[in-house]
């Protein structure tokens, strides 16, 4: 089975400042299944990826660790590649954006944009850290919200009232890096003139290159008006210098998508493949990007505009997926559900997760929930109970009674053809990225096979020597039907498929190899292909995740400046009280807010707290916390907030303060 189609497929580049977690794996498993499906069809389908290795967070983390950014990103890249390999995610080339190929391509694209009049210079004002001597990105400034007066809020939005603003609007701003008060400074920046390409983008986004939900979302952004895109950053910065411009660097989001091209360029250079055949604006090949919904703006607006403006082809399609939740909630370090790939691998088989994600992915932008009871049931019932059980039941008789040799004919060719007739529909489901539909169809086929074996009961017939020919025929039929099933599952379960090929003593399975059954064929001794999931292993994984991530949490250690000191009299003005949460409910229309009713012993107060993503309402009711009881009430669009609860945070999670046993509602905190 061969095809003249040529495809290049990419996944979003994982950021090179930390290990992979299960949220990353949703996309990379989704991509890998799709690529394997097409390779089994005989299509030249090349998949590339790499680490996103530039930006301020990497520069600062390397500094914190006392190593160079190059050393940090090289170490993380090895970790990412090791995890991908363990999960059978097989890119044809895995590179890094910190590479000569990427620098050359980024420079070429920038110079072409500049020559075409698409680069605009503007002087902007932004916060500058006088201690670190660097301009501060929005998330590296904190202060008091200018709208609701909530303290310790980031420079781009308030987690309490939901307001968005400029960092320079903050009251009493502080640098997250040094603790110093930032000053405003001017700097000349380079902008890509995105509005020039509005009509091109409107046309491109409405021609089937995106899912309908994404196209509709982009329409909202078009209505709001496209803005020129800042593509430069000031030194110090870890990235590529802008040619001929001292102390200016390309913004990480300029060279990150160019990293797709750079990874493929490296692949081409090593294998003698034509780069231009795939990236020239007249290319007849196909280009597909798999991305998360949080980076659609970059991939569906900036990226195609930048490619078209610099003389390269635009993507055939950008496929977007939703986020991963665990037990219906955002992944949480405190609950142990922020699970790194390596923590999962220490306890569970990687193909359990590949199968589970496949059973839930449907080609839309819906979020995907990992529910561990469902996870156990699907793996144990489907993979072990249905599919593997067919091979183990039939192979035992073939191995022991018939010298490992299958019979010379099928005793139910109609059933064999019935399973084969599902092939085109299964392929279509995989190609359409509706893996859940493919899995349902495959399990329907598995049910038919198990019904056949249960109806014929070879284990009963085997007790009668005169019935051994029937046993031979039934088990030969079962092995051949299993062969069809494992071929259908091969894009999802490549490791199990390889083990099955060895057991079946067959050539690598593909979509066209299963028409002719294995008859009068010697198989090898069966070895268990997959074992049942044990709930204890899931519990151990969650416990490890909670322990390891909590102990390695980044500690906020902001230096205290003399100018920030307050007197004991000032502190005494703050009335801190023990409060019991008697009711909690998420605020509709607010991503982060939870409405709390707090009992202070002799009174109740309503407080809006930015803890919605960290806690479920049910788990808050009845617990004690600490609140600022004498804060001036403030009117928000959701109601009046009469105080503030105290919580700790590290930029990754929020942890509500809770007093020790014996504290009662209304007690003063001294």
UniProtKB/Swiss-Prot annotation:
Question: What EC numbers are recorded for this enzyme?
Answer: 6.1.1.10
Q: Which residues form the tRNA-binding domain?
A: 570-670
What biological processes does GO assign it? methionyl-tRNA aminoacylation
This entry's comment on the bound cofactor is: Binds 1 zinc ion per subunit.
User: What is this enzyme's catalytic activity, as reactions?
Assistant: tRNA(Met) + L-methionine + ATP = L-methionyl-tRNA(Met) + AMP + diphosphate
The Swiss-Prot or TrEMBL record lists the needed cofactor(s) as: Zn(2+)
Entries under InterPro entries matching the protein: aa-tRNA-synth_I_CS, Anticodon_Met, Met-tRNA-synth_bsu_C, Met-tRNA_ligase_1, Met-tRNA_synth, Methionyl/Leucyl_tRNA_Synth, MetRS_core, MetRS_Zn
Q: Name one Pfam family in it.
A: tRNA-synt_1g
Q: List the GO cellular component terms.
A: cytosol
Q: Which residues bind Zn(2+)?
A: 145, 148, 158, 161
Q: Does the keyword Transferase apply?
A: no
Q: What does this protein do?
A: Is required not only for elongation of protein synthesis but also for the initiation of all mRNA translation through initiator tRNA(fMet) aminoacylation.
Name the family: Belongs to the class-I aminoacyl-tRNA synthetase family. MetG type 1 subfamily.
Protein name in the entry: Methionine--tRNA ligase
Species of provenance: Legionella pneumophila (strain Lens)
């Amino acid at each position: 089975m061969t095809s003249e189609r040529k495809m290049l497929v990419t996944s979003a580049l994982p950021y090179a400042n930390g290990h992979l977690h299960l949220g990353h794996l949703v996309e990379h498993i989704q991509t890998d299944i799709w690529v394997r499906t097409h390779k089994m069809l005989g299509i030249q389908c090349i998949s590339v990826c790499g680490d996103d290795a530039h930006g301020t967070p990497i520069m600062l983390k390397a500094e914190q660790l006392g190593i160079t950014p190059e050393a940090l990103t090289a170490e993380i890249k090895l970790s990412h590649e090791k995890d991908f390999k363990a999960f059978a995610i097989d890119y044809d080339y895995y590179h890094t954006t910190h590479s000569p190929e990427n620098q050359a391509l980024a420079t070429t694209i920038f110079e072409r944009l500049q020559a075409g009049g698409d680069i605009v210079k503007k002087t902007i004002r932004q916060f500058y850290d006088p201690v670190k001597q660097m301009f501060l990105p929005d998330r590296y400034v904190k202060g008091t919200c200018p709208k609701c007066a909530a303290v310790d809020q980031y420079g781009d939005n308030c987690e309490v009232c939901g307001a968005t603003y400029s960092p320079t609007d903050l009251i009493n701003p502080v640098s997250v890096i040094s603790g110093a008060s930032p000053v405003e400074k001017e700097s000349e920046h380079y902008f890509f003139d995105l509005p020039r390409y509005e009509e091109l983008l409107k046309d491109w986004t409405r021609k089937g290159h995106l899912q309908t939900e994404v196209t509709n979302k982009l329409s909202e952004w078009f209505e709001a008006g496209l803005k020129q895109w800042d593509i430069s950053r000031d030194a110090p910065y870890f990235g590529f210098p802008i040619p001929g411009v001292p102390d200016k660097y390309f913004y990480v989001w300029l060279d990150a998508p160019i990293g797709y091209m750079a990874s493929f360029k490296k692949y081409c250079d090593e294998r003698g493949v034509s780069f231009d055949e795939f990236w020239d604006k007249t290319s007849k090949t196909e280009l597909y990007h798999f991305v998360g919904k949080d980076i659609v703006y970059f991939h569906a607006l900036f990226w195609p505009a930048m490619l078209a403006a610099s003389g390269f082809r635009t993507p055939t399609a950008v496929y977007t997926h939703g986020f991963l939740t665990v037990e219906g909630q955002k992944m949480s370090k405190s609950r142990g559900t922020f699970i790194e790939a390596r923590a999962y691998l220490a306890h569970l088989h990687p193909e359990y997760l590949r199968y589970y994600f496949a059973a839930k992915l449907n080609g839309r932008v819906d979020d995907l929930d990992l529910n561990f009871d469902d996870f156990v049931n699907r793996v144990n019932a489907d993979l072990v109970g249905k599919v593997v059980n067919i091979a183990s039941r039939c192979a035992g008789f073939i191995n022991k009674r018939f010298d490992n040799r299958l019979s010379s004919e099928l005793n139910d060719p109609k059933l064999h053809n019935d399973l084969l007739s599902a092939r085109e529909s299964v392929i279509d489901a995989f190609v359409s990225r509706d893996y859940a539909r493919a899995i349902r169809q495959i399990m329907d086929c598995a049910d038919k096979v198990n019904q056949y074996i249960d109806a014929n009961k070879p284990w009963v017939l085997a007790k009668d020597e005169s019935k051994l020919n029937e046993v031979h025929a039934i088990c030969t039929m079962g092995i051949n039907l299993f062969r069809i099933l494992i071929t259908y599952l091969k894009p999802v379960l490549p490791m199990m498929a390889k083990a099955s090929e060895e057991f079946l003593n067959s050539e690598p399975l593909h979509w066209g190899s299963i028409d002719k059954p294995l008859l009068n064929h010697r198989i090898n001794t069966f070895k268990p292909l997959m074992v049942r999931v044990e709930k204890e292993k899931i519990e151990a994984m969650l416990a490890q995740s909670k322990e390891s991530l909590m102990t390695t949490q980044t500690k906020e250690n902001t230096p205290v400046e003399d100018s920030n000191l307050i007197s004991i009299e000032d502190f005494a003005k703050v009335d801190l009280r023990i409060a019991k949460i008697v009711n909690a409910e998420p605020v509709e229309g607010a991503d982060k807010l939870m409405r709390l009713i707090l009992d202070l012993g002799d009174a109740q107060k309503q407080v809006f707290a930015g803890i919605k993503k960290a806690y479920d309402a049910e788990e808050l009711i009845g617990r004690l916390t600490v609140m600022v009881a004498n804060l001036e009430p403030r009117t928000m669009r959701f109601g009046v907030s009469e105080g503030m609860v105290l919580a700790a945070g590290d930029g990754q999670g929020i942890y509500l303060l809770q007093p020790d046993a014996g504290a009662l509602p209304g007690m003063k905190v001294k």
